[in-house]
Amino acid sequence: MDSSYSVISKTSYVELQKPTVNGKPRNKLLPSDEESFVNDFDDARNGVGGEDADDLDFDVADYPLVHGKSSNQGSGIYGAVFNLTTSIIGAGIMALPATMKVLGLVLGFVLIILMALLSEISVELLVRFSVLYKSKSYGEVVQFALGKTARVLSEICIIVNNGGVLVVYLIIMGDVMSGSLHHIGVLDQWLGNGFWDHRKVLILIVMVIFLAPLCALNKIDSLSVTSAASVALAVVFVVVCFVVATIKLIEGTIDPPRLSPDFGSKQAILDLLVVIPIMSNAYVCHFNVQPIYNELEGRSPHKMNRVGRITTAICVVVYASTAVSGYLLFGKDTESDILTNFDQDLGIRFSSAVNYIVRIGYILHLVLVFPVIHFSLRETVNTLLFEGSPPLSESKKRSLGLTVVLLALIYIGSTMIPNIWTAFKFTGATSAVSLGFTFPALIALRLGKQSNSLSFVERSVSWLMLILAVVVSIVGTIGNIYSLESKSD
C-alpha cells in the first residue's frame, strides 16, 4: 500500500519540548505532573525534606532530560583516584620520615592512620554538601554555609597552601639536582661543578621545558595519565626504601629507632609542636575534590566516596611504608627532605645506582604532580580575581596569562625559602589545616543543621575535627614562632 510517509533515519532524533514560558524556551522534557522531581531536589537543597535529604545519592547533572544538556564523558573511577592520590602524595611524603624521627615510630604510625581517617571523613562530608547545594567549587560550598567573607578566606587559604606546596616542589628539585649546603647534587656527581648545576638556572629550565606545558592544560581530566605515572614513580620510591631498610635490618646494621617522642630538651619539644601541622598537611587534597568530582563520569556522592576511600587506603600504605623505612634507614640523621639523604653510601650493593633511581624517579614524580596542584591554584585565583567571568576553558588568553604569572611567582618564592621544613610547618599550621578540617567541619555543622542530615556520630566527629584544627593551628603557630626566635638567638 502506497504511503506519503517516509522512513526516518536511525541517526535522526526528535526533541520534544513544551512551549515557551514567560517568553523563555523550556529545556525540560518532563511532563507537568513530574515536575515534582525537580522541586523535591530543590527542597532538599534548601534544607526542606528533613531526613530525605540524606538519601540523595545522585547528581542531577547526570539527568540531561532535566537540564536539557547531554552528559559529557569524564574520567572513570581510577582516573579520579590517580588525580586525587597525586593531589595528596607530593612533597609531603618527603617530610614524613623527619616527623617520625621526632614523634617516634608508635605515635607517628598512629597519627598517620588517625589523620587519614579524619581526612577521609571530611572529604565525604564536603562531597555530600557540595552535591546537596549544587556547588561547583570549594569556595561555593563554603559560601553557602558561612557567607561570602568565609568564601574569600577559603580561597586565600587554597592559594597560600597550593602556592606553598608548589614552592616546596621546586625547592626539592633544586636540592636534589644541584645540591644543598650539606649534600651534593646529582648533576655535581655526574658532570662536576659548573654553570649547569646553578640552582636558580636549573629550576627555571625545568619550569619552562617540563612544567609550563603541563600547567597550560585546561582540564584536570587531561592529567589522569600523568597522575598515574606519578603514582607509579612514588610507589617505586617506597618499594626501594622498604627493600633497602629490610636488607639492612636483616643484616643488623640499623640503629634502634626511637619508639616515642623525646621530651629531653627545649628543641625536641619545639620540634614536636611543629611536626603535628606537618602531619595534618599530609592528606590535604580538598581543594581538588570538587574539580575531580565535576569531571567524574556518571558522578554521584557514592562514586566519589569510593574514589576517596581507595585513595586514602593507597596513601596510608605509601605514607606508613615511607615514614618507617626512611627513618629506619637514616635514623637521627634523617633530613627534613629525605631525598637529600640519598647522596651517601647506603651500605648495600649497587648503592650508587639505587641512589640515582630514587632521586631522579622522585624528581620526575614531582614534575608530574606539579600541574595537578597548579590546576586548582589557577582556578581559585581566577575565581577570586575575575568573579563572574567565563570559565578558563573558554578564555585561553586569560588561562595562559594566569599560568605565566603564577609560575613566575612560584619560581621567585622557591629562590627565597631555605628548605621544605620551613614551608611545610607554616602552611600546615595555617592554610592546610583550615582547608582539610576547619572549613569542612564548619560546613557540615552549619548545613547539616539546616537540612537535618547529620547523624549524632557525624556531628560529634565534625566537632572533634573543628577542635583539633583550632588546637593544631594555635600550637603549631606558637611552635613555629618560638622555633624562629630560638634560631635567631
Swiss-Prot record:
Coiled-coil stretches are: none
| Keywords, sorted A to Z | Amino-acid transport, Endoplasmic reticulum, Membrane, Transmembrane, Transmembrane helix, Transport, Vacuole
Question: What single Pfam family name could you report for this chain, choosing any that match?
Answer: Aa_trans
GO cellular component: a single term: endoplasmic reticulum membrane
UniProt entry tagged with the keyword Transmembrane: yes
Primary localization: endoplasmic reticulum
State the compartments where it is located.
Answer: Endoplasmic reticulum membrane; Vacuole membrane
Q: Where are the transmembrane segments?
A: 76-96, 102-122, 156-176, 201-221, 227-247, 269-289, 310-330, 357-377, 404-424, 425-445, 461-481
The record's Gene Ontology biological-process terms are: amino acid transport
Q: Does the keyword Isomerase apply?
A: no
- Membrane topology value: Multi-pass membrane protein
UniProt record similarity statement: Belongs to the amino acid/polyamine transporter 2 family. Amino acid/auxin permease (AAAP) (TC 2.A.18.6) subfamily.
- The entry's protein name is Amino acid transporter AVT6E
Organism equals Arabidopsis thaliana (Mouse-ear cress)
Gene behind the chain? AVT6E
